A protein has these predicted regions:
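Extended recognition/assembly regions associated with phosphoester-bond processing machinery
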Residues: 258, 262-264
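Interdomain motor-coupling "hinge/lid" segment immediately C-terminal to the ATP-binding subdomain
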Residues: 2-108
Length: 274
């Protein structure tokens, strides 16, 4: 947020991600799964899958992780987990964003309204004019609020490959920051396809440059194309593309350029950017 530049003169600022699936398994199943690079996963995913599936029922744990595995405090009071998430969200929107962004506190209801609209539809391509009209704010205010929600780790605002980056630039696709937020904030039925995409984007964004692909779902590090889907996801959208992969849910093992979703980011590499 705006306060980061002032604080950075006096302290080192870290952005701490919630549990990766690897960390979740290590914590809950007392495993010691190592960190690997994305390249290692792409080159050796079958051998890695075999080694892990022999140790743990990954698909059951992965389903649980998507619902309540991102924030470590789930194990303290499982029945109150979503209530605690909502309390944290309210704290960020009602206190932290106004203080750190200089937003008038009377506008926090607008920010919260925007967040819940995103929760109902994410991931989606935003129509800035319609969104600003629906909430009753200007275009620039809407873009500033979207930027604040992204910096607060409540949303992920992604641009298409080849796009520039600006605080007042319309995001090409909006996501909630992680799948647990989807289950906590959405009052409607959760679409599993949206959950898969949100998980994939969340796990990559802290360590890799991630963009919306022109041909598929995601374009990573200016090189790799990924299409995310269920176990029967076909390769039509990546045919003819180099360094292109299917990331499929509900499978324990992959083959060739089809990788299990649970494995694709079970080993998160060290960050390559601040």
């Amino acid at each position: 947020l705006n306060a980061k530049s002032d604080l950075s003169r006096r302290a080192i600022v870290y952005e701490m991600q919630g549990f990766s699936f690897r960390e979740y398994l290590n914590w809950n199943e007392k495993l010691s799964l190592p960190i690997l690079t994305l390249n290692n996963i792409l080159d050796n995913h079958l051998a890695l899958s075999v080694g892990i599936v022999d140790k743990v029922k990954v698909l059951k744990h992965f389903s649980d992780y998507l619902k309540h595995g991102y924030y470590p405090y789930y194990n303290e009071l499982p029945a109150l987990y979503y209530s605690r998430i909502n309390e944290v969200v309210n704290l960020i929107v009602e206190l932290e964003i106004p203080q750190l962004r200089g937003v008038d506190i009377s506008y926090t209801t607008k920010i919260k309204q925007l967040l819940y609209i995103i929760a109902e539809s994410a991931p989606f391509i935003p129509n800035v004019s319609k969104l600003s009209e629906r909430i009753g704010i200007s275009r620039n205010s809407l873009l500033a609020y979207l930027d604040a929600l992204h910096d607060s780790c409540l949303t992920m605002n992604l641009q298409k490959e080849g796009s520039g980056i600006s605080r007042l630039q319309k995001p090409d696709k909006l996501f909630l920051e992680n799948p647990n937020l989807m289950y906590a904030l959405s009052a409607s039925q959760i679409d599993i396809g949206n959950v898969r995409e949100t998980f994939f984007a969340n796990q990559l964004r802290y360590c890799h440059k991630i963009n919306v692909s022109k041909e598929s779902d995601f374009f990573i590090d200016g090189r790799y194309t990924f299409e995310v889907g269920g176990r029967h996801k076909g390769k039509q959208q990546i045919n003819g593309l180099s360094d292109a992969y299917i990331v499929a849910d509900d499978i324990e093992y992959g083959i060739n350029n089809k990788i299990p979703l649970w494995l694709s980011l079970i080993h998160i590499s060290e960050p390559t950017r601040p």
